[in-house]
């Protein structure tokens, strides 16, 4: 199988006052390219921590994470995060003083400063995510929650990352909007070959993914 991300013998812990709190112990797992994963578990079990580690925003205490067979530490965390991985948060994490166009363009300029995209191309691109010209010209804090999340997803995909990490992306959305967002993720996987890894508390949404990963808080590990 084509493993785009591979976790090898990973330990992660942190100091909590005088105590050491272990989150993961000897974690091993491989994520296949072009698959849709959900991560489920109790609050505080380490779901978001796992996403942060996969994004290269923190380092494991032991072990390694491989992207395309290379340790992300050797790739360089900054390069890895900018070029290969995009994160979508529950609270959208958009630049509220900018409109949808400029949110996407700002992200592109950070991930690939040499890349140019025309207004016409951006119009067509955002429209595929349900953001028409009128909405695209509004400051994003004037859009609905579902529309803001669509902009966040469009921004992530525009950066051409192969991996999309989503932390409770539907947590603030109603049921119908949540289903629409899940449909977008499915299209990214099936039509564009992206790998989507999503944290969720929603069992119904988790069952829409290809693989459900459970975090075992007692054994500090994961299983399908």
Give the location of each predicted region:
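ABC ATPase NBD coupling module
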Residues: 72-86
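Helix-to-loop junction immediately C-terminal to a conserved catalytic motif
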Residues: 55
């Amino acid at each position: 199988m084509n493993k785009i991300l591979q976790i090898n013998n990973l330990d992660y812990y942190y100091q909590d006052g005088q105590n050491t709190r272990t989150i993961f112990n000897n974690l091993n797992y491989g994520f296949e390219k072009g698959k849709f994963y959900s991560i489920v578990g109790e609050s505080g079990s380490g779901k978001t921590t796992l996403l942060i580690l996969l994004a290269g925003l923190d380092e494991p205490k032991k072990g390694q994470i491989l992207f395309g067979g290379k340790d992300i530490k050797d790739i360089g965390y900054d390069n890895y995060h900018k070029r290969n991985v995009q994160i979508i948060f529950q609270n959208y994490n958009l630049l509220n003083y900018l409109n949808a166009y400029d949110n996407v363009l700002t992200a592109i300029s950070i991930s690939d400063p040499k890349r140019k995209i025309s207004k016409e191309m951006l119009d067509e691109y955002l429209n595929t995510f349900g953001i028409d010209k009128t909405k695209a010209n509004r400051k994003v804090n004037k859009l609905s929650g579902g529309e803001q999340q669509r902009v966040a997803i469009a921004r992530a995909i525009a950066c051409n990352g192969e991996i999309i990490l989503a932390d409770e992306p539907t947590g603030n959305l109603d049921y119908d909007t949540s289903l629409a967002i899940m449909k977008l993720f499915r299209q990214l996987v099936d039509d564009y070959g992206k790998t989507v890894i999503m944290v969720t508390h929603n069992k119904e949404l988790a069952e829409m993914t290809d693989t459900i990963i459970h975090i075992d808080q007692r054994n500090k590990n994961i299983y399908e």
